[in-house]
């Protein structure tokens, strides 16, 4: 895997990407996404906050400590969702090799499951089983809801969604981190994986949202005036 790096203001062009729940307390909510089936949701405020904390921490940590399964932008999101919902036992922490002590509570209303955790909607059929895999387009269509075209509306853990019709794999996602526990220099960090291209497997990158708005290629600026920036989306797992 290419070495992860913190991206300065003069950014290189972003890469492209290919892009039985056992516990009763996990409830479902309809109508959060147009044409989407019933959605998983953590309605408990404490669990929602715990999930968001873990999700942001794990996505951010993947920049500093590469994860084998994270090979594109959607894989980063799947990894962070899945591992946020696990019990974070001493053995889990040992294997995760996080750069710091998390100090976060676990999500108590988590799905049952061991290594295999089908968590994602992949169809508009409400009876369709959940899946372990969802690409970027599927994550947005069935597992997230639109928040705003204004990137300033993003909360930690929200997704920035781009669609680049001219590319072979047009859908690309970034995760808004906000303040980073690994870098105290700003409060608007974003992380993402470029995905593979003809030059190699791609890499994790980290950049400030403010710098991204001045990206040398206008199509990657998270601005309402940029038609390739679809907007800010929020995982339906959290309110």
Please place each PLM-identified region on the residue numbering.
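N-terminal capping segments
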Residues: 28-131
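Signal peptide processing junction and immediate N-terminal pro/mature segment
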Residues: 20-30
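Long alpha-helical scaffolds
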Residues: 5-6, 59
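N-terminal secretory signal peptides that target proteins for export/translocation
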Residues: 1-2
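Bacterial N-terminal signal peptides
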Residues: 8-22
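Low-complexity, Gly/Ser/Thr/Pro-rich intrinsically disordered linker/tail segments
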Residues: 187-239
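...with weaker cross-activation on analogous glycine-rich loops/strands in unrelated enzymes
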Residues: 100-199
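Surface-exposed flexible segments
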Residues: 6, 173-180, 207-215
